[in-house]
Design a protein with these regions (language model features):
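Terminal targeting signals and extreme-terminal segments of soluble enzymes
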Residues: 1-142
Length: 142
C-alpha cells in the first residue's frame, strides 16, 4: 500500500474514533501526513469555553486544542499501538482566541524510541493565536 493510501486510512480512523475530551472541544481531524509528519485539526470554541463576558476562550481550553493534535499525530504515526502521555507542555498565548472555529497544526520536532518532542500552532482566521511545544512519552499498548 502506498503512503498516501496508508495516510488516508489513518485519517479515516482518527476521524471515526474520538474521545469524549476531544468531542467536548468540537474536534475534527482534517489532515494527516506521515511524511512529513503533520496533522491538522479543527476545533469549535463555544461560549461555555469563554470568560470576560464571552469574549476570550479560557487558556485551559486553548491548551487542550494544542495538546490534542500532537497526541493524535503520534497515535497515527504509530498505527494506534502507543499511548502518548504528555510529560510537559509549554504554551505561548499570542492573541485572544474567540468563539468559533480554530485550526491547530502539529508537527514532530524529534522522535526517539520512547520520547517525542512536538510542536503545535493554533490559528483563528489565519491569525496565530497560540503555540506550544511538548515532550511526550510513548507508552506501548499491551
Amino acid at each position: 500500500m502506498d503512503q498516501a493510501m496508508e495516510d488516508s486510512k489513518i485519517l479515516k480512523s482518527l476521524q471515526s474514533n474520538s474521545a469524549p475530551c476531544t468531542d467536548t472541544l468540537g474536534a475534527y481531524v482534517t489532515k494527516f501526513s506521515s511524511k512529513p509528519p503533520e496533522i491538522e485539526m479543527e476545533f469549535q470554541a463555544i461560549k461555555d469555553f469563554t470568560h470576560s463576558d464571552g469574549q476570550v476562550v479560557q487558556g485551559g481550553f486553548v491548551t487542550g486544542m494544542l495538546d490534542a493534535p500532537m497526541a493524535h499525530l503520534l497515535m497515527g504515526l504509530f498505527n494506534f499501538e502507543i499511548i502518548p502521555m504528555t510529560l510537559d507542555i509549554n504554551v505561548s498565548f499570542l492573541a485572544p482566541s474567540r468563539q468559533g472555529k480554530l485550526v491547530a497544526v502539529a508537527e514532530v520536532l524529534q522522535l526517539g524510541k520512547s520520547t517525542a518532542f512536538m510542536t503545535s500552532k493554533l490559528y483563528q482566521k489565519d491569525l496565530l493565536v497560540a503555540s506550544s511545544t511538548s515532550t511526550v512519552k510513548l507508552v506501548k499498548l499491551n
